Amino acid sequence: MESLLAVQGQDFVLTASSSSAVRGITVLKPDDDKSQILNSHNLMLYCGEAGDTTNFAEYIAANISLYTLRHNLNLSPEATASFTRKQLATSLRSRKPYQVNILLAGYETNLGKPELFWLDYLATCVRVPYACQGYSSFYCLSIFDRYYKPDLTIDEAVRIMKLCFDELKKRMPIDFKGFICKVVDKDGIREINI
């Protein structure tokens, strides 16, 4: 019962991931960070099968670091999403495909704009202004539809996230143990408290 949320603002992407690691009815870890920093301006949030998620996230991070070392070039969010999608597509054709759903948030430093990508385990990749993965999409997409606008400020995005958190607390029969929220902008990636 993992939840990932993200919304793109004027010059940032605000992300949130549920902080509990749950297996069945048992909470295994109350402070599980479901994100992986890929480089200074790319952040990947992931959910899915427990072993697959961590393994795939570390694999992508290591390969992006290797590319950066070899070519002395940081991948853009779009290039990172394309590479990640290719790896999911290749895995899908194997005997043991990764069962991982992803939100990829990044800031394109050359163009000075934020980008958000939604990827699923079937290697679908879509650029979106806001996104959800997991059961949260049943309740939060309508909130994003209602309140999203392209020129969101960070305060407005935080308010929308709070509305989503309140709706999930009200509707979901599970306690997510809070959310870990991060911002990706021109200054890089930082964690914030909401």
From Swiss-Prot:
<keyword id="KW-0647">Proteasome</keyword>
<comment type="subunit">
    <text>The 26S proteasome consists of a 20S proteasome core and two 19S regulatory subunits. The 20S proteasome core is composed of 28 subunits that are arranged in four stacked rings, resulting in a barrel-shaped structure. The two end rings are each formed by seven alpha subunits, and the two central rings are each formed by seven beta subunits. The catalytic chamber with the active sites is on the inside of the barrel.</text>
</comment>
<dbReference type="Pfam" id="PF00227">
    <property type="entry name" value="Proteasome"/>
</dbReference>
<dbReference type="InterPro" id="IPR016050">
    <property type="entry name" value="Proteasome_bsu_CS"/>
</dbReference>
<keyword id="KW-0963">Cytoplasm</keyword>
<keyword id="KW-0539">Nucleus</keyword>
<dbReference type="GO" id="GO:0043161">
    <property type="term" value="P:proteasome-mediated ubiquitin-dependent protein catabolic process"/>
</dbReference>
<dbReference type="GO" id="GO:0005635">
    <property type="term" value="C:nuclear envelope"/>
</dbReference>
<dbReference type="InterPro" id="IPR023333">
    <property type="entry name" value="Proteasome_suB-type"/>
</dbReference>
<dbReference type="GO" id="GO:0019774">
    <property type="term" value="C:proteasome core complex, beta-subunit complex"/>
</dbReference>
<comment type="function">
    <text>Non-catalytic component of the proteasome, a multicatalytic proteinase complex which is characterized by its ability to cleave peptides with Arg, Phe, Tyr, Leu, and Glu adjacent to the leaving group at neutral or slightly basic pH. The proteasome has an ATP-dependent proteolytic activity.</text>
</comment>
<dbReference type="InterPro" id="IPR001353">
    <property type="entry name" value="Proteasome_sua/b"/>
</dbReference>
<protein>
    <recommendedName>
        <fullName>Probable proteasome subunit beta type-4</fullName>
    </recommendedName>
</protein>
<dbReference type="GO" id="GO:0005634">
    <property type="term" value="C:nucleus"/>
</dbReference>
<comment type="similarity">
    <text>Belongs to the peptidase T1B family.</text>
</comment>
<dbReference type="InterPro" id="IPR029055">
    <property type="entry name" value="Ntn_hydrolases_N"/>
</dbReference>
<dbReference type="GO" id="GO:0005829">
    <property type="term" value="C:cytosol"/>
</dbReference>
<dbReference type="InterPro" id="IPR035206">
    <property type="entry name" value="Proteasome_beta2"/>
</dbReference>
